Swiss-Prot record:
Zn(2+) 2 binds at residues 48, 50, 53. The keyword Metal-binding applies. Binds 2 Zn(2+) ions per subunit. It catalyses: S-(hydroxymethyl)glutathione = glutathione + formaldehyde. The gene is gfa. It comes from Bradyrhizobium sp. (strain ORS 278). Zn(2+) 1 binds at residues 27, 29, 95, 98. This is Glutathione-dependent formaldehyde-activating enzyme. Residues 20-167 form the CENP-V/GFA domain.
Amino acid sequence: MTVHIHPSVDHGVKQGSGHFAGGTLVCKCHDRPVKVGIKGDVAHNHACGCTKCWKPSGATFSVVAVVPRQNVTVLENGDKLKIVDASAVIQRYACTGCGTHMYGRIENTGHPFYGLDFIHPELFQEQGSAAPGFAAFVSSVIESGVKPEQMGEIRARLKELGLEPYDCLSPALMDAIATHVAKAKAA
Protein backbone atom coordinates (compact mmCIF):
# COMPACT_ATOMS: atom_id res chain seq x y z
CA MET A 1 0.00 0.00 0.00
CA THR A 2 1.35 3.41 -0.96
CA VAL A 3 1.58 5.92 1.85
CA HIS A 4 0.27 9.31 0.71
CA ILE A 5 2.04 12.29 2.25
CA HIS A 6 0.93 15.27 0.12
CA PRO A 7 0.11 15.60 -3.60
CA SER A 8 3.12 17.85 -4.23
CA VAL A 9 5.61 15.22 -2.98
CA ASP A 10 3.87 11.86 -3.45
CA HIS A 11 5.54 11.30 -6.83
CA GLY A 12 8.91 12.61 -5.65
CA VAL A 13 10.15 15.91 -4.30
CA LYS A 14 10.67 18.33 -7.18
CA GLN A 15 13.74 20.46 -6.59
CA GLY A 16 13.46 24.24 -6.85
CA SER A 17 15.02 26.26 -9.63
CA GLY A 18 17.61 27.86 -7.35
CA HIS A 19 16.66 31.32 -8.60
CA PHE A 20 12.94 31.63 -7.78
CA ALA A 21 12.10 35.34 -7.61
CA GLY A 22 8.70 34.90 -5.98
CA GLY A 23 5.22 34.73 -7.37
CA THR A 24 1.52 34.74 -6.62
CA LEU A 25 -0.34 32.42 -4.25
CA VAL A 26 -3.93 31.77 -5.38
CA CYS A 27 -6.73 30.22 -3.31
CA LYS A 28 -9.03 27.49 -4.68
CA CYS A 29 -12.03 29.73 -5.46
CA HIS A 30 -13.20 29.95 -9.07
CA ASP A 31 -14.99 33.25 -8.39
CA ARG A 32 -12.91 36.14 -7.05
CA PRO A 33 -9.90 34.08 -5.87
CA VAL A 34 -7.70 35.59 -3.19
CA LYS A 35 -4.24 36.37 -4.55
CA VAL A 36 -1.18 37.03 -2.39
CA GLY A 37 2.11 38.26 -3.81
CA ILE A 38 5.38 36.83 -2.48
CA LYS A 39 8.77 38.44 -3.18
CA GLY A 40 11.71 36.05 -3.27
CA ASP A 41 12.06 32.35 -2.59
CA VAL A 42 10.75 30.44 0.41
CA ALA A 43 12.85 29.10 3.30
CA HIS A 44 12.53 26.06 5.56
CA ASN A 45 10.00 24.40 3.25
CA HIS A 46 8.78 21.19 4.88
CA ALA A 47 5.98 18.68 5.28
CA CYS A 48 4.11 19.47 8.51
CA GLY A 49 2.01 17.01 10.46
CA CYS A 50 0.42 19.48 12.87
CA THR A 51 -3.36 19.74 12.93
CA LYS A 52 -3.42 23.54 12.50
CA CYS A 53 -1.84 23.79 9.05
CA TRP A 54 -4.10 23.76 5.98
CA LYS A 55 -3.71 20.82 3.65
CA PRO A 56 -5.56 19.73 0.54
CA SER A 57 -8.20 17.03 0.78
CA GLY A 58 -6.69 13.57 1.20
CA ALA A 59 -3.25 14.82 2.29
CA THR A 60 -1.73 13.47 5.50
CA PHE A 61 0.69 16.41 5.83
CA SER A 62 0.65 20.02 4.77
CA VAL A 63 3.59 21.54 2.95
CA VAL A 64 4.58 24.87 4.48
CA ALA A 65 7.48 27.31 4.24
CA VAL A 66 8.36 30.78 5.51
CA VAL A 67 9.10 34.12 3.89
CA PRO A 68 9.91 37.51 5.44
CA ARG A 69 6.63 39.22 6.36
CA GLN A 70 7.59 42.35 4.41
CA ASN A 71 7.65 40.15 1.28
CA VAL A 72 3.94 39.28 1.58
CA THR A 73 1.29 41.48 -0.04
CA VAL A 74 -2.42 40.77 -0.50
CA LEU A 75 -3.03 41.58 -4.17
CA GLU A 76 -6.68 40.72 -4.80
CA ASN A 77 -9.86 39.98 -2.85
CA GLY A 78 -8.36 40.50 0.60
CA ASP A 79 -11.90 41.18 1.84
CA LYS A 80 -12.37 37.39 1.74
CA LEU A 81 -9.57 36.74 4.26
CA LYS A 82 -10.34 35.98 7.89
CA ILE A 83 -8.19 34.75 10.78
CA VAL A 84 -9.00 31.09 11.49
CA ASP A 85 -8.16 31.07 15.23
CA ALA A 86 -7.39 34.39 16.89
CA SER A 87 -5.98 32.59 19.97
CA ALA A 88 -3.32 30.71 17.96
CA VAL A 89 0.31 31.88 17.92
CA ILE A 90 0.26 31.83 14.12
CA GLN A 91 -2.62 33.97 12.86
CA ARG A 92 -3.66 31.96 9.79
CA TYR A 93 -5.50 34.04 7.19
CA ALA A 94 -7.91 31.82 5.26
CA CYS A 95 -10.24 32.49 2.37
CA THR A 96 -13.83 32.51 3.62
CA GLY A 97 -14.96 31.08 0.28
CA CYS A 98 -12.85 27.93 -0.05
CA GLY A 99 -11.10 27.67 3.33
CA THR A 100 -7.57 27.76 1.89
CA HIS A 101 -5.01 29.25 4.29
CA MET A 102 -3.19 31.95 2.34
CA TYR A 103 -0.60 33.00 4.92
CA GLY A 104 0.06 32.81 8.63
CA ARG A 105 1.56 35.64 10.65
CA ILE A 106 3.02 35.81 14.16
CA GLU A 107 2.21 39.12 15.86
CA ASN A 108 4.09 38.43 19.12
CA THR A 109 7.34 40.41 18.73
CA GLY A 110 8.99 38.18 21.35
CA HIS A 111 8.41 34.98 19.37
CA PRO A 112 11.52 33.43 17.74
CA PHE A 113 9.79 33.37 14.33
CA TYR A 114 8.38 36.91 14.50
CA GLY A 115 8.97 38.54 11.13
CA LEU A 116 8.42 35.35 9.15
CA ASP A 117 5.10 34.52 7.50
CA PHE A 118 4.05 30.93 6.83
CA ILE A 119 2.80 30.04 3.35
CA HIS A 120 1.86 26.97 1.32
CA PRO A 121 4.16 26.92 -1.76
CA GLU A 122 1.82 24.60 -3.70
CA LEU A 123 -0.47 27.64 -4.09
CA PHE A 124 2.08 29.45 -6.27
CA GLN A 125 0.94 30.02 -9.86
CA GLU A 126 4.62 29.85 -10.79
CA GLN A 127 6.99 26.90 -10.55
CA GLY A 128 10.48 26.77 -9.02
CA SER A 129 10.26 27.64 -5.32
CA ALA A 130 12.63 25.83 -2.96
CA ALA A 131 11.67 22.20 -2.36
CA PRO A 132 10.60 20.71 0.97
CA GLY A 133 13.65 19.51 2.90
CA PHE A 134 12.31 17.75 6.00
CA ALA A 135 9.13 16.73 7.82
CA ALA A 136 8.11 18.30 11.15
CA PHE A 137 5.64 17.30 13.86
CA VAL A 138 5.36 13.86 12.30
CA SER A 139 3.70 12.16 15.30
CA SER A 140 0.98 14.82 15.28
CA VAL A 141 -0.68 13.15 12.28
CA ILE A 142 -2.04 10.66 14.83
CA GLU A 143 -4.13 13.54 16.23
CA SER A 144 -5.71 13.96 12.79
CA GLY A 145 -6.82 10.33 12.60
CA VAL A 146 -3.78 8.38 11.39
CA LYS A 147 -3.51 5.03 13.18
CA PRO A 148 -0.38 4.79 15.39
CA GLU A 149 0.56 1.49 13.76
CA GLN A 150 0.93 3.34 10.42
CA MET A 151 3.71 5.58 11.72
CA GLY A 152 6.54 3.25 10.76
CA GLU A 153 5.36 3.22 7.14
CA ILE A 154 4.89 6.99 7.16
CA ARG A 155 8.38 7.65 8.52
CA ALA A 156 9.87 5.20 6.01
CA ARG A 157 8.04 6.94 3.14
CA LEU A 158 9.22 10.37 4.31
CA LYS A 159 12.81 9.12 4.39
CA GLU A 160 12.36 7.56 0.94
CA LEU A 161 11.29 10.99 -0.32
CA GLY A 162 14.34 12.61 1.30
CA LEU A 163 12.26 14.32 3.99
CA GLU A 164 13.94 13.51 7.31
CA PRO A 165 11.12 13.04 9.87
CA TYR A 166 11.21 15.01 13.13
CA ASP A 167 8.68 15.14 15.94
CA CYS A 168 9.45 18.82 16.41
CA LEU A 169 11.17 21.14 13.93
CA SER A 170 14.46 20.48 12.16
CA PRO A 171 17.65 20.78 14.26
CA ALA A 172 18.56 24.09 12.57
CA LEU A 173 15.18 25.60 13.48
CA MET A 174 15.29 24.20 17.03
CA ASP A 175 18.77 25.76 17.40
CA ALA A 176 17.38 29.09 16.16
CA ILE A 177 14.61 28.96 18.77
CA ALA A 178 17.05 28.09 21.58
CA THR A 179 19.42 30.88 20.47
CA HIS A 180 16.55 33.39 20.50
CA VAL A 181 15.49 32.29 23.99
CA ALA A 182 19.09 32.44 25.30
CA LYS A 183 19.58 35.96 23.91
CA ALA A 184 16.27 37.09 25.40
CA LYS A 185 17.28 35.75 28.83
CA ALA A 186 20.68 37.48 28.61
CA ALA A 187 19.14 40.86 27.72
